[in-house]
Amino acid sequence: MKFIVIKIGGSTLSDMHPSIINNIKHLRSNNIYPIIVHGGGPFINEALSNQQIEPHFVNGLRVTDKATMTITKHTLIADVNTALVAQFNQHQCSAIGLCGLDAQLFEITSFDQQYGYVGVPTALNKDALQYLCTKFVPIINSIGFNNHDGEFYNINADTLAYFIASSLKAPIYVLSNIAGVLINDVVIPQLPLVDIHQYIEHGDIYGGMIPKVLDAKNAIENGCPKVIIASGNKPNIIESIYNNDFVGTTILNS
């Protein structure tokens, strides 16, 4: 089976181009199995604000106490994931919404106590995911369940998507509200792994792009063949990436 992991950023979900679903249907008709992983940061922040809870981040990761976890779980599973599945189904693309608890899809462990209920994935139930792919488009949110303490945890959606891609040795398309990796305000078409640290040291890659490219580097070193970072707001973006039409930035081991 040939898989493509497609990570849709929370900032893109409300402005996702409708052609994305048609592109995914086309992939499936060619026996390529897309797996969707999504975040939901803006929706979580709005839900927290409605409860007068101030979001708190350390090193770019959301600190998740018990109250924040409860709201995050409800937002990602009941609101964002359900809406995305409905959108796919309305376009005659049968989808199924999943979190880590469903079919014991992925195992997690606690990341670091200072972050509270933040987890990292440690194992993927490939058999379950492969079976589901034959029937539906899996749409996976970033809520995991820790079998050891019986608690739900929030996972960074990029981290989860890269982990799934590495585990399946599949390419990953990271769709967000940015067009790719910018160097001197220009999107570079390719970013070899050997150049990443140099660009970071020189300040050419900075801010939120640093963890994205470092996670991409780690994914490629662990089995993912390539990572493409591109805008999710462009028409037929998935088809363009699949056809190597030089959109966004391709990160690869060369």
UniProtKB/Swiss-Prot annotation:
InterPro entries: AceGlu_kinase-like_sf (IPR036393), AcgluKinase_fam (IPR004662), ArgB (IPR037528), Asp/Glu/Uridylate_kinase (IPR001048)
Single annotated GO MF: acetylglutamate kinase activity
Metabolic or biological pathway, per its Swiss-Prot or TrEMBL entry: Amino-acid biosynthesis; L-arginine biosynthesis; N(2)-acetyl-L-ornithine from L-glutamate: step 2/4
GO BP, sorted A to Z: arginine biosynthetic process via ornithine; L-arginine biosynthetic process
Annotated TM spans: none
Keyword Endoplasmic reticulum appears in the UniProt entry: no
UniProt similarity note: Belongs to the acetylglutamate kinase family. ArgB subfamily.
This protein's name: Acetylglutamate kinase
Residues that, per the record, bind substrate: G40, G41, R62, N154
Keyword Cell membrane: no
Entry keyword set: Amino-acid biosynthesis, Arginine biosynthesis, ATP-binding, Cytoplasm, Kinase, Nucleotide-binding, Transferase
Entry's localization field: Cytoplasm
EC number(s) per entry: 2.7.2.8
Function of the molecule: Catalyzes the ATP-dependent phosphorylation of N-acetyl-L-glutamate.
Catalytic activity: N-acetyl-L-glutamate + ATP = N-acetyl-L-glutamyl 5-phosphate + ADP
Annotated site residue numbers, Transition state stabilizer: K7, K212
Record gene name: argB
Native organism taxonomy: Bacteria, Bacillati, Bacillota, Bacilli, Bacillales
GO cellular component term, pick one: cytoplasm
Superkingdom: Bacteria
